[in-house]
Design a protein with these regions (language model features):
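Non-catalytic peripheral regions of nucleotide-handling enzymes
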Residues: 11-12, 16
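C-terminal motif of bacterial Sec signal peptides marking the signal peptidase cleavage site
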Residues: 18-21
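Mature soluble binding/inhibitory domains
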Residues: 23-482
Length: 482
Protein backbone atom coordinates (compact mmCIF):
# COMPACT_ATOMS: atom_id res chain seq x y z
CA UNK A 1 0.00 0.00 0.00
CA UNK A 2 1.26 3.48 -0.84
CA UNK A 3 1.62 5.75 2.18
CA UNK A 4 3.28 8.67 0.40
CA UNK A 5 0.25 10.86 0.85
CA UNK A 6 0.17 10.24 4.59
CA UNK A 7 3.82 11.17 4.93
CA UNK A 8 3.04 14.34 3.03
CA UNK A 9 0.10 15.22 5.25
CA UNK A 10 2.17 14.70 8.36
CA UNK A 11 5.01 16.80 7.04
CA UNK A 12 2.50 19.49 6.24
CA UNK A 13 1.20 19.26 9.80
CA UNK A 14 4.74 19.67 11.05
CA UNK A 15 5.37 22.52 8.64
CA UNK A 16 2.82 24.80 10.21
CA UNK A 17 4.44 25.10 13.64
CA UNK A 18 7.99 24.60 12.43
CA UNK A 19 8.51 27.07 9.64
CA UNK A 20 6.99 29.99 11.49
CA UNK A 21 7.97 29.28 15.08
CA UNK A 22 11.42 27.92 14.38
CA UNK A 23 12.75 30.40 11.86
CA UNK A 24 12.31 28.23 8.78
CA UNK A 25 10.65 30.98 6.80
CA UNK A 26 7.18 32.46 6.60
CA UNK A 27 3.88 31.74 4.94
CA UNK A 28 5.03 33.39 1.74
CA UNK A 29 8.37 31.62 1.58
CA UNK A 30 8.58 28.64 3.93
CA UNK A 31 11.95 27.00 4.25
CA UNK A 32 12.62 23.27 3.96
CA UNK A 33 10.99 21.13 6.59
CA UNK A 34 13.67 19.90 8.95
CA UNK A 35 12.59 18.80 12.39
CA UNK A 36 16.12 18.95 13.78
CA UNK A 37 16.32 22.72 13.33
CA UNK A 38 13.93 23.27 16.27
CA UNK A 39 14.55 23.16 19.97
CA UNK A 40 12.44 23.43 23.06
CA UNK A 41 8.71 23.82 23.42
CA UNK A 42 8.47 26.08 20.37
CA UNK A 43 8.66 23.02 18.14
CA UNK A 44 5.45 21.40 19.41
CA UNK A 45 5.05 17.64 19.76
CA UNK A 46 8.25 15.70 19.14
CA UNK A 47 9.09 12.01 19.46
CA UNK A 48 6.76 9.40 20.93
CA UNK A 49 3.64 10.52 22.78
CA UNK A 50 3.57 10.47 26.55
CA UNK A 51 1.78 7.62 28.24
CA UNK A 52 -1.28 9.75 28.92
CA UNK A 53 -1.71 10.61 25.27
CA UNK A 54 -0.58 7.50 23.54
CA UNK A 55 -1.51 4.53 25.67
CA UNK A 56 -5.08 5.38 26.47
CA UNK A 57 -4.35 4.52 30.10
CA UNK A 58 -5.65 7.85 31.33
CA UNK A 59 -8.52 10.08 30.36
CA UNK A 60 -8.21 13.61 29.07
CA UNK A 61 -5.43 14.90 26.85
CA UNK A 62 -1.79 15.53 27.50
CA UNK A 63 -0.42 19.02 26.88
CA UNK A 64 0.64 19.22 23.24
CA UNK A 65 -1.49 16.25 22.18
CA UNK A 66 -3.06 16.52 18.73
CA UNK A 67 -6.06 14.37 19.64
CA UNK A 68 -7.69 12.78 22.71
CA UNK A 69 -6.00 9.96 24.61
CA UNK A 70 -6.22 6.73 22.62
CA UNK A 71 -8.73 5.20 25.01
CA UNK A 72 -10.92 8.31 24.81
CA UNK A 73 -11.20 8.63 21.02
CA UNK A 74 -14.04 6.08 20.98
CA UNK A 75 -16.05 8.29 23.34
CA UNK A 76 -16.74 10.81 20.55
CA UNK A 77 -19.04 10.20 17.61
CA UNK A 78 -18.36 12.88 15.03
CA UNK A 79 -21.43 14.31 13.33
CA UNK A 80 -20.77 16.33 10.22
CA UNK A 81 -21.07 16.79 6.51
CA UNK A 82 -19.25 15.90 3.32
CA UNK A 83 -18.72 17.67 0.02
CA UNK A 84 -20.91 15.00 -1.55
CA UNK A 85 -23.96 16.50 0.16
CA UNK A 86 -24.03 13.80 2.83
CA UNK A 87 -24.65 13.95 6.57
CA UNK A 88 -22.43 11.40 8.29
CA UNK A 89 -21.81 10.10 11.79
CA UNK A 90 -18.44 8.49 12.45
CA UNK A 91 -17.05 6.68 15.47
CA UNK A 92 -13.49 5.37 15.70
CA UNK A 93 -12.31 2.89 18.32
CA UNK A 94 -8.58 3.52 18.47
CA UNK A 95 -7.96 0.52 20.72
CA UNK A 96 -9.97 -2.10 18.82
CA UNK A 97 -8.88 -0.34 15.57
CA UNK A 98 -12.38 -0.35 14.09
CA UNK A 99 -14.81 2.26 12.83
CA UNK A 100 -18.55 2.64 12.41
CA UNK A 101 -19.83 5.06 9.79
CA UNK A 102 -23.45 5.85 8.99
CA UNK A 103 -24.79 7.92 6.13
CA UNK A 104 -27.76 9.76 7.64
CA UNK A 105 -28.49 11.73 4.46
CA UNK A 106 -27.06 11.08 1.01
CA UNK A 107 -27.59 11.72 -2.71
CA UNK A 108 -24.93 9.14 -3.66
CA UNK A 109 -26.50 6.11 -5.38
CA UNK A 110 -26.33 2.83 -3.52
CA UNK A 111 -25.39 1.03 -6.74
CA UNK A 112 -23.29 2.31 -9.64
CA UNK A 113 -25.38 2.64 -12.78
CA UNK A 114 -28.49 3.84 -10.95
CA UNK A 115 -29.63 7.11 -9.38
CA UNK A 116 -31.92 5.71 -6.70
CA UNK A 117 -31.94 4.54 -3.98
CA UNK A 118 -29.10 6.41 -2.26
CA UNK A 119 -26.82 5.14 0.47
CA UNK A 120 -28.74 7.16 3.09
CA UNK A 121 -29.44 4.95 6.11
CA UNK A 122 -26.57 2.57 5.39
CA UNK A 123 -24.22 1.84 8.28
CA UNK A 124 -20.88 0.20 7.64
CA UNK A 125 -18.18 -1.14 9.90
CA UNK A 126 -14.57 -1.80 9.09
CA UNK A 127 -11.01 -1.67 10.31
CA UNK A 128 -8.92 1.44 10.69
CA UNK A 129 -5.19 1.43 10.19
CA UNK A 130 -2.55 3.88 11.25
CA UNK A 131 0.13 4.74 8.75
CA UNK A 132 3.08 2.46 9.62
CA UNK A 133 5.93 3.45 11.89
CA UNK A 134 8.14 5.88 10.02
CA UNK A 135 5.44 6.97 7.59
CA UNK A 136 4.78 10.09 9.68
CA UNK A 137 7.45 12.18 11.39
CA UNK A 138 6.15 11.69 14.94
CA UNK A 139 4.40 8.95 16.84
CA UNK A 140 1.75 11.46 17.92
CA UNK A 141 0.75 12.17 14.33
CA UNK A 142 0.59 8.45 13.54
CA UNK A 143 -1.63 7.96 16.58
CA UNK A 144 -4.18 10.54 15.43
CA UNK A 145 -4.41 9.49 11.74
CA UNK A 146 -6.80 6.71 10.73
CA UNK A 147 -7.16 5.12 7.30
CA UNK A 148 -10.72 3.87 6.74
CA UNK A 149 -10.06 0.53 5.08
CA UNK A 150 -12.98 -0.99 3.12
CA UNK A 151 -16.09 -1.45 5.24
CA UNK A 152 -19.46 -3.07 4.64
CA UNK A 153 -22.99 -3.21 5.96
CA UNK A 154 -26.55 -4.10 4.99
CA UNK A 155 -28.69 -1.61 3.09
CA UNK A 156 -32.14 -1.84 4.65
CA UNK A 157 -33.79 -0.33 1.58
CA UNK A 158 -33.14 -3.43 -0.56
CA UNK A 159 -31.35 -5.90 1.73
CA UNK A 160 -28.15 -5.78 -0.31
CA UNK A 161 -24.66 -5.73 1.15
CA UNK A 162 -23.01 -2.38 0.64
CA UNK A 163 -19.22 -2.34 0.53
CA UNK A 164 -16.70 0.45 -0.05
CA UNK A 165 -14.08 -1.95 -1.41
CA UNK A 166 -14.71 -1.03 -5.05
CA UNK A 167 -14.16 2.68 -4.43
CA UNK A 168 -11.06 2.24 -2.25
CA UNK A 169 -7.92 3.66 -3.88
CA UNK A 170 -4.76 2.56 -2.10
CA UNK A 171 -2.88 5.60 -3.35
CA UNK A 172 -5.50 8.08 -2.11
CA UNK A 173 -7.69 6.34 0.46
CA UNK A 174 -10.26 7.86 2.82
CA UNK A 175 -8.44 9.00 5.94
CA UNK A 176 -9.56 10.82 9.07
CA UNK A 177 -7.35 13.12 11.11
CA UNK A 178 -8.81 13.22 14.61
CA UNK A 179 -8.27 16.47 16.48
CA UNK A 180 -9.56 18.03 19.66
CA UNK A 181 -13.29 18.48 19.18
CA UNK A 182 -13.17 17.97 15.44
CA UNK A 183 -12.34 15.31 12.86
CA UNK A 184 -11.64 15.96 9.20
CA UNK A 185 -10.28 14.41 6.06
CA UNK A 186 -12.11 12.05 3.74
CA UNK A 187 -14.91 9.49 3.95
CA UNK A 188 -15.39 6.63 1.45
CA UNK A 189 -16.01 7.75 -2.10
CA UNK A 190 -17.99 6.09 -4.88
CA UNK A 191 -18.28 5.63 -8.63
CA UNK A 192 -21.27 7.45 -10.09
CA UNK A 193 -22.85 6.70 -13.48
CA UNK A 194 -26.30 6.66 -15.10
CA UNK A 195 -27.13 5.92 -18.73
CA UNK A 196 -30.21 8.13 -18.67
CA UNK A 197 -33.83 7.60 -19.66
CA UNK A 198 -35.32 6.62 -22.99
CA UNK A 199 -38.38 8.77 -23.67
CA UNK A 200 -40.58 8.33 -26.76
CA UNK A 201 -40.02 11.09 -29.33
CA UNK A 202 -37.40 12.74 -27.08
CA UNK A 203 -34.71 10.09 -27.50
CA UNK A 204 -32.41 8.14 -25.20
CA UNK A 205 -29.79 9.12 -22.66
CA UNK A 206 -32.05 11.79 -21.16
CA UNK A 207 -30.48 12.92 -17.88
CA UNK A 208 -27.39 10.75 -18.31
CA UNK A 209 -24.58 11.07 -15.77
CA UNK A 210 -21.09 10.37 -17.05
CA UNK A 211 -19.05 7.75 -15.20
CA UNK A 212 -16.83 9.36 -12.57
CA UNK A 213 -14.90 7.86 -9.69
CA UNK A 214 -14.35 9.71 -6.41
CA UNK A 215 -11.52 8.39 -4.22
CA UNK A 216 -13.08 10.01 -1.17
CA UNK A 217 -15.38 12.87 -0.26
CA UNK A 218 -14.01 15.69 1.93
CA UNK A 219 -15.53 15.53 5.41
CA UNK A 220 -15.70 17.69 8.52
CA UNK A 221 -17.31 16.47 11.73
CA UNK A 222 -17.79 17.77 15.27
CA UNK A 223 -17.50 15.95 18.59
CA UNK A 224 -20.05 18.36 20.07
CA UNK A 225 -23.20 19.53 18.27
CA UNK A 226 -26.54 20.96 19.31
CA UNK A 227 -30.15 21.16 18.16
CA UNK A 228 -30.77 24.17 20.38
CA UNK A 229 -31.99 26.68 17.79
CA UNK A 230 -31.27 29.54 20.22
CA UNK A 231 -27.57 29.02 19.42
CA UNK A 232 -28.13 29.97 15.76
CA UNK A 233 -29.48 33.55 15.53
CA UNK A 234 -27.16 36.12 14.01
CA UNK A 235 -25.57 37.14 10.74
CA UNK A 236 -23.08 34.79 9.11
CA UNK A 237 -20.72 34.76 6.17
CA UNK A 238 -20.93 31.56 4.18
CA UNK A 239 -18.76 29.91 1.55
CA UNK A 240 -20.57 27.34 -0.61
CA UNK A 241 -19.36 24.67 -3.04
CA UNK A 242 -21.89 22.67 -5.10
CA UNK A 243 -21.90 20.41 -8.15
CA UNK A 244 -24.54 18.97 -10.50
CA UNK A 245 -23.79 15.45 -11.84
CA UNK A 246 -26.46 15.70 -14.55
CA UNK A 247 -24.73 18.87 -15.77
CA UNK A 248 -21.48 16.98 -16.44
CA UNK A 249 -20.44 17.67 -12.85
CA UNK A 250 -20.56 21.44 -13.26
CA UNK A 251 -19.31 23.10 -10.08
CA UNK A 252 -19.59 26.47 -8.43
CA UNK A 253 -18.11 28.20 -5.40
CA UNK A 254 -19.75 31.34 -4.09
CA UNK A 255 -20.24 33.39 -0.95
CA UNK A 256 -23.30 34.58 0.92
CA UNK A 257 -24.23 36.76 3.87
CA UNK A 258 -27.25 35.36 5.70
CA UNK A 259 -29.16 36.28 8.85
CA UNK A 260 -31.03 33.74 10.98
CA UNK A 261 -33.71 34.47 13.56
CA UNK A 262 -34.75 32.57 16.68
CA UNK A 263 -37.21 30.44 14.69
CA UNK A 264 -34.64 29.25 12.16
CA UNK A 265 -35.76 31.54 9.35
CA UNK A 266 -33.14 32.91 6.98
CA UNK A 267 -33.01 36.24 5.15
CA UNK A 268 -30.38 37.52 2.75
CA UNK A 269 -29.70 39.98 -0.03
CA UNK A 270 -26.79 38.00 -1.47
CA UNK A 271 -26.23 37.93 -5.22
CA UNK A 272 -27.75 34.81 -6.79
CA UNK A 273 -25.39 33.10 -9.27
CA UNK A 274 -26.54 32.98 -12.88
CA UNK A 275 -28.95 30.10 -13.42
CA UNK A 276 -29.49 29.66 -9.69
CA UNK A 277 -32.64 30.09 -7.63
CA UNK A 278 -32.51 31.51 -4.11
CA UNK A 279 -35.11 30.95 -1.41
CA UNK A 280 -38.13 33.23 -1.26
CA UNK A 281 -36.21 35.32 1.28
CA UNK A 282 -33.02 35.51 -0.78
CA UNK A 283 -30.92 32.85 0.98
CA UNK A 284 -28.49 30.48 -0.76
CA UNK A 285 -28.03 27.87 2.00
CA UNK A 286 -31.53 27.72 3.45
CA UNK A 287 -35.03 27.13 2.07
CA UNK A 288 -37.80 26.78 4.63
CA UNK A 289 -37.11 27.48 8.32
CA UNK A 290 -34.74 25.03 9.98
CA UNK A 291 -36.42 22.25 11.98
CA UNK A 292 -34.68 19.80 14.30
CA UNK A 293 -34.06 16.26 13.07
CA UNK A 294 -34.09 13.48 15.67
CA UNK A 295 -30.61 12.44 14.51
CA UNK A 296 -29.04 15.62 15.87
CA UNK A 297 -29.07 18.13 13.02
CA UNK A 298 -31.53 20.46 11.26
CA UNK A 299 -33.50 20.14 8.00
CA UNK A 300 -34.70 22.76 5.55
CA UNK A 301 -36.95 21.91 2.61
CA UNK A 302 -36.88 23.45 -0.88
CA UNK A 303 -33.15 24.03 -0.66
CA UNK A 304 -31.91 26.88 -2.87
CA UNK A 305 -30.05 26.14 -6.09
CA UNK A 306 -26.89 27.98 -7.15
CA UNK A 307 -26.37 26.14 -10.45
CA UNK A 308 -28.57 25.67 -13.53
CA UNK A 309 -30.78 22.61 -13.20
CA UNK A 310 -31.51 19.76 -15.58
CA UNK A 311 -34.37 20.58 -17.92
CA UNK A 312 -36.70 17.70 -18.80
CA UNK A 313 -38.10 17.40 -22.32
CA UNK A 314 -41.49 19.06 -22.74
CA UNK A 315 -41.93 20.19 -19.12
CA UNK A 316 -38.54 21.77 -18.30
CA UNK A 317 -36.89 21.90 -14.83
CA UNK A 318 -38.73 20.15 -12.02
CA UNK A 319 -38.09 22.76 -9.33
CA UNK A 320 -36.55 22.46 -5.88
CA UNK A 321 -36.83 19.00 -4.33
CA UNK A 322 -33.39 18.84 -2.68
CA UNK A 323 -33.05 19.31 1.08
CA UNK A 324 -30.56 21.31 3.13
CA UNK A 325 -29.18 19.93 6.38
CA UNK A 326 -27.36 21.95 9.04
CA UNK A 327 -25.01 20.57 11.68
CA UNK A 328 -24.51 23.13 14.45
CA UNK A 329 -20.97 22.45 15.58
CA UNK A 330 -19.82 23.59 19.01
CA UNK A 331 -16.07 24.10 19.09
CA UNK A 332 -13.69 26.32 21.03
CA UNK A 333 -16.59 28.37 22.38
CA UNK A 334 -18.03 29.08 18.93
CA UNK A 335 -21.15 27.91 17.13
CA UNK A 336 -20.13 26.91 13.59
CA UNK A 337 -22.93 25.93 11.19
CA UNK A 338 -22.00 23.36 8.54
CA UNK A 339 -24.63 23.02 5.81
CA UNK A 340 -24.92 20.35 3.13
CA UNK A 341 -27.35 20.35 0.24
CA UNK A 342 -28.59 16.84 -0.54
CA UNK A 343 -29.87 16.46 -4.07
CA UNK A 344 -32.99 14.43 -4.83
CA UNK A 345 -34.08 12.32 -7.80
CA UNK A 346 -37.33 10.49 -8.46
CA UNK A 347 -37.45 9.21 -12.01
CA UNK A 348 -41.23 9.15 -12.07
CA UNK A 349 -43.50 7.11 -14.31
CA UNK A 350 -42.60 5.55 -17.66
CA UNK A 351 -42.82 6.01 -20.56
CA UNK A 352 -42.87 9.83 -20.57
CA UNK A 353 -41.62 10.45 -17.00
CA UNK A 354 -43.55 13.71 -16.86
CA UNK A 355 -43.69 13.49 -13.05
CA UNK A 356 -39.94 12.99 -12.63
CA UNK A 357 -38.16 15.17 -10.08
CA UNK A 358 -34.53 15.76 -10.96
CA UNK A 359 -32.74 18.12 -8.58
CA UNK A 360 -29.31 16.54 -8.22
CA UNK A 361 -27.36 19.60 -7.08
CA UNK A 362 -25.40 18.71 -3.95
CA UNK A 363 -22.62 20.29 -1.94
CA UNK A 364 -21.36 21.83 1.26
CA UNK A 365 -21.08 25.22 2.96
CA UNK A 366 -19.29 26.48 6.06
CA UNK A 367 -20.68 29.50 7.88
CA UNK A 368 -18.91 31.84 10.30
CA UNK A 369 -20.30 34.69 12.40
CA UNK A 370 -19.94 38.05 10.66
CA UNK A 371 -17.52 39.39 13.25
CA UNK A 372 -14.57 41.53 12.22
CA UNK A 373 -11.23 39.71 11.95
CA UNK A 374 -8.03 41.76 11.97
CA UNK A 375 -4.83 40.76 10.21
CA UNK A 376 -3.31 37.96 12.26
CA UNK A 377 -6.68 37.06 13.75
CA UNK A 378 -6.67 33.52 12.37
CA UNK A 379 -2.96 32.95 11.86
CA UNK A 380 -1.73 29.38 12.04
CA UNK A 381 -1.50 26.06 10.32
CA UNK A 382 -4.61 24.25 9.10
CA UNK A 383 -5.14 20.72 7.79
CA UNK A 384 -8.11 19.26 5.96
CA UNK A 385 -9.26 18.29 2.48
CA UNK A 386 -10.35 20.19 -0.60
CA UNK A 387 -12.23 20.14 -3.89
CA UNK A 388 -9.13 18.67 -5.56
CA UNK A 389 -9.78 15.47 -3.55
CA UNK A 390 -6.50 15.92 -1.74
CA UNK A 391 -5.48 16.11 1.89
CA UNK A 392 -4.12 19.59 2.34
CA UNK A 393 -2.28 21.94 4.64
CA UNK A 394 -2.40 25.72 4.66
CA UNK A 395 -0.35 28.36 6.41
CA UNK A 396 -1.93 31.70 7.28
CA UNK A 397 0.30 34.53 8.48
CA UNK A 398 -1.12 38.03 8.45
CA UNK A 399 -1.81 39.12 4.89
CA UNK A 400 -0.14 36.05 3.38
CA UNK A 401 -1.36 32.48 2.97
CA UNK A 402 0.16 29.40 1.36
CA UNK A 403 -0.87 25.94 0.24
CA UNK A 404 1.70 23.27 1.09
CA UNK A 405 2.18 20.26 -1.15
CA UNK A 406 1.49 16.98 0.68
CA UNK A 407 4.09 15.19 -1.45
CA UNK A 408 7.00 17.64 -1.14
CA UNK A 409 6.17 19.78 1.91
CA UNK A 410 7.04 22.82 -0.19
CA UNK A 411 4.84 25.56 -1.56
CA UNK A 412 2.33 24.17 -4.04
CA UNK A 413 2.41 27.53 -5.80
CA UNK A 414 3.21 31.18 -5.00
CA UNK A 415 1.49 32.52 -1.90
CA UNK A 416 -1.93 34.17 -1.97
CA UNK A 417 -2.70 37.49 -0.32
CA UNK A 418 -5.41 38.23 2.22
CA UNK A 419 -7.37 41.48 2.41
CA UNK A 420 -8.95 42.22 5.79
CA UNK A 421 -10.43 45.55 4.69
CA UNK A 422 -13.66 44.40 3.06
CA UNK A 423 -16.90 46.11 4.03
CA UNK A 424 -18.47 42.88 5.29
CA UNK A 425 -17.15 42.04 8.80
CA UNK A 426 -15.39 38.68 8.94
CA UNK A 427 -15.22 38.22 5.17
CA UNK A 428 -11.60 38.18 4.02
CA UNK A 429 -10.63 38.81 0.42
CA UNK A 430 -8.22 36.40 -1.28
CA UNK A 431 -6.11 37.00 -4.39
CA UNK A 432 -3.78 34.35 -5.81
CA UNK A 433 -0.56 35.00 -7.71
CA UNK A 434 -2.45 34.89 -11.03
CA UNK A 435 -4.94 37.53 -9.97
CA UNK A 436 -7.78 35.06 -9.33
CA UNK A 437 -9.94 36.19 -6.44
CA UNK A 438 -12.06 34.66 -3.74
CA UNK A 439 -12.81 34.74 -0.04
CA UNK A 440 -11.87 33.16 3.27
CA UNK A 441 -13.74 32.90 6.58
CA UNK A 442 -12.74 31.57 10.00
CA UNK A 443 -14.43 30.67 13.29
CA UNK A 444 -13.73 28.39 16.23
CA UNK A 445 -10.40 27.20 14.86
CA UNK A 446 -11.86 26.27 11.46
CA UNK A 447 -11.37 28.04 8.18
CA UNK A 448 -12.77 27.82 4.66
CA UNK A 449 -11.45 29.27 1.43
CA UNK A 450 -12.93 29.60 -2.05
CA UNK A 451 -11.00 30.94 -5.06
CA UNK A 452 -12.17 31.27 -8.65
CA UNK A 453 -9.01 29.69 -10.01
CA UNK A 454 -6.95 26.52 -10.24
CA UNK A 455 -5.18 26.14 -6.91
CA UNK A 456 -3.13 23.76 -4.84
CA UNK A 457 -1.95 21.59 -7.73
CA UNK A 458 -5.33 21.00 -9.36
CA UNK A 459 -7.61 17.98 -9.29
CA UNK A 460 -6.41 14.50 -8.38
CA UNK A 461 -6.57 12.56 -11.65
CA UNK A 462 -8.17 9.49 -10.07
CA UNK A 463 -11.16 11.59 -8.95
CA UNK A 464 -11.70 13.45 -12.21
CA UNK A 465 -12.58 12.88 -15.84
CA UNK A 466 -10.54 14.29 -18.71
CA UNK A 467 -12.97 17.19 -19.11
CA UNK A 468 -13.42 17.98 -15.41
CA UNK A 469 -12.44 21.62 -14.80
CA UNK A 470 -9.91 22.48 -12.10
CA UNK A 471 -11.86 25.56 -11.11
CA UNK A 472 -13.26 26.82 -8.82
CA UNK A 473 -11.34 25.83 -5.69
CA UNK A 474 -12.80 25.16 -2.24
CA UNK A 475 -11.15 23.91 0.93
CA UNK A 476 -11.90 23.54 4.64
CA UNK A 477 -9.31 23.08 7.37
CA UNK A 478 -8.96 22.76 11.14
CA UNK A 479 -6.26 24.65 13.00
CA UNK A 480 -3.43 22.57 14.44
CA UNK A 481 -0.96 25.33 15.33
CA UNK A 482 -0.70 29.05 15.91
Amino acid sequence: MSYAIFRGVALAICAAPLVVACGGGNAGNPGPINSTQCSGASCGVQGPPTSGAGSGSSSGTTAGALCPATGDIVKSTYLGGAGSGEVVSLNIDAQAMTYTLKWLESPIPLHTGTVTPSRAGVQITGAVAHPPTGALPTAEQIRCAFILTPGSGTASVDGSTYSTAASFNQANPPMILVGLGVAGGGIPGATVEFDGLSIPLAGSGIGAVKNRHFDFYPFLGFASTTTDISKLPGTYNGLLYHLVPSGNYQTIATNASETFDASGNCTSSSTVPAGGSASSTGCLTTGTAWTANTSGYFDSQQAPQILPQFSKPIVGPSGKSGTAHMVLGQINGATVPLVVRTGFINLGTAPLYLDAKIDDESGIALLAKATAIASGGFDGGYVGADSNFKYTASLIQGTTGSFISPSTSQLEEPAFTLNYGLSTPGLIGVTDSNGKTGYAIASGGLYAIAIQGEENGGLTSTSANSDTPNTPYFGVGAQISK
